[in-house]
Amino acid sequence: MKDFAAIDFETANGKRTSVCSVGIVIVKGGRIVNKIYRLIRPAPNYYTQWTTAIHGLTYDDTMEADDFPEVWAEIKPLLEGLPLVAHNSPFDEGCLRAVHELYGMTYPN
């Protein structure tokens, strides 16, 4: 089995830039070697009723969370050389691209 990282974003509202949490599982040699879950202060920072109904997160949960660039700086080194997979890859990749663009960050290959 190949090594990989599975990633899942949740958003605060209908904008892909509004990531409010990220979950990652890193698999190497067929075994889970790391699990990461971080709350993120979304941009724009407001929640819709329907997104909260999906994931249960609210403004209060993320009001003191780090912005995406700080969270990504911690996570990025752990993902080096690993392909990313996602259950709903068009959504999750769209979120990843959107927040990189929003913050003027270079999108990872």
Where are these regions (language model features)?
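Conserved non-catalytic scaffold segment of RNase H-like nuclease domains
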Residues: M1-N109
